[in-house]
């Protein structure tokens, strides 16, 4: 928090989002809320990688006019767009961090790209479960999508999970193999 405040004229952040791959326990929720002052919204989100859900993208249908008959929506040739999300309850949403992306093909920016297409033709979403925080899912999903593109160790377009989970898991493995590192303070970037 001190590092943030030094770079922001002493201000505290308006919002802090904490990701975890297991559910938040009551004492963890209370500790997170107690760690920040009243001016900071604390959003606690469990990110579940494996779900049984899939999604199908449809082309829009057309209304008939004059002699032209109506056309029903039909499955699209490409999967759900990356960034699509669907709330399934007030505290849960499905988010597709993998999927069809426009604008990355240099020869034709209108061409859909789906990098997992050969191995997994239909992308599956991740399940987001909110334990603290409020509002809609748009800001939460956009922040998470941004974090799926921040893996500095490869040149892929995106990962399925955000770096907040990928690198914390990797860091835990390193500490498990080198327990003497626990007592020292290191820049987290050294472990990326």
Show where each model-derived region lies.
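Long, contiguous domain-sized segments
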Residues: 1-192
């Amino acid at each position: 928090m001190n590092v943030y405040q030094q770079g922001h004229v002493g201000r505290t952040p308006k919002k802090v989002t904490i990701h975890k791959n297991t559910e938040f326990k009551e004492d963890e929720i209370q500790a997170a809320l107690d760690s920040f002052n009243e001016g900071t919204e604390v959003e606690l989100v469990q990110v579940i990688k494996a779900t049984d859900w899939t999604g199908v993208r449809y082309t829009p249908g057309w209304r008939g006019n004059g002699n032209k008959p109506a056309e029903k929506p039909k499955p699209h040739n490409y999967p759900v767009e990356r960034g699509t999300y669907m709330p399934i309850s007030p505290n849960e949403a499905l988010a597709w961090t993998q999927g069809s992306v426009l604008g990355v093909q240099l020869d034709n920016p209108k061409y859909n790209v789906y990098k997992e297409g050969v191995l997994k033709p239909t992308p599956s979403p991740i399940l987001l479960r909110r334990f603290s925080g409020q509002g809609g899912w748009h800001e939460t999903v956009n922040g998470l999508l941004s974090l799926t593109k921040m893996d500095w160790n490869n040149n892929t377009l995106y990962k399925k999970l955000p770096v907040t989970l990928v690198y914390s898991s990797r860091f835990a493995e390193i500490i498990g193999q080198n327990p003497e590192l626990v007592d020292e303070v290191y820049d987290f970037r050294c472990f990326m």
